[in-house]
Amino acid sequence: MGQNPKRLLKRAEFLAVRRGEKRRGRFFLVEVLDRGDGGVPRVGYTVTKKVGNAVVRNRVRRRLKEAVRVHAADDMVPGNDYVIVGRDDALRAPFGQLKAELSRRFRGTR
């Protein structure tokens, strides 16, 4: 099992990842930036106001965080930063499907 990713916390870190590759999924968008240092992967979560009120956005964020923690962190590439932009469908998706989709996007496969 790989080590758990660290969190992206600062606005500048989130903006830097926007320059990287974008991998679109049905339930979310994953933005990926290779830092080039081979260190522990870092991940940040964003859910826009288009998704719903604060309660709904936090539920989407919590589901994505748990999917990464339980399963998808093993598929993250060391030295990469990831920003996961949650979509409305992430709230209604079966958890197994959400985990599988995250793993595919982290590996860069369709």
UniProtKB/Swiss-Prot annotation:
SUPFAM superfamilies reported for this sequence: Ribosomal protein S5 domain 2-like
Specify the domain of life of the species encoding this protein: Bacteria
Organism of derivation: Mesorhizobium japonicum (strain LMG 29417 / CECT 9101 / MAFF 303099)
Q: Which family does it belong to?
A: Belongs to the RnpA family.
* Catalysed reactions listed for this entry: Endonucleolytic cleavage of RNA, removing 5'-extranucleotides from tRNA precursor
Please report a single Pfam family linked to this protein: Ribonuclease_P
Q: Name one GO biological process term.
A: tRNA 5'-leader removal
**Broad enzyme group:** hydrolase
Any one GO MF annotation of this record: ribonuclease P activity
An annotated GO cellular component: ribonuclease P complex
Gene behind the chain: rnpA
Q: How does it assemble?
A: Consists of a catalytic RNA component (M1 or rnpB) and a protein subunit.
What PROSITE patterns does the record point to? Answer: RIBONUCLEASE_P (PS00648)
User: Which parts of the chain span the membrane according to its record?
Assistant: none
This protein is called Ribonuclease P protein component
- Which E.C. number(s) belong to this protein? 3.1.26.5
Write out the function statement from the record: RNaseP catalyzes the removal of the 5'-leader sequence from pre-tRNA to produce the mature 5'-terminus. It can also cleave other RNA substrates such as 4.5S RNA. The protein component plays an auxiliary but essential role in vivo by binding to the 5'-leader sequence and broadening the substrate specificity of the ribozyme.
Its keywords, alphabetically, are:
Endonuclease, Hydrolase, Nuclease, RNA-binding, tRNA processing
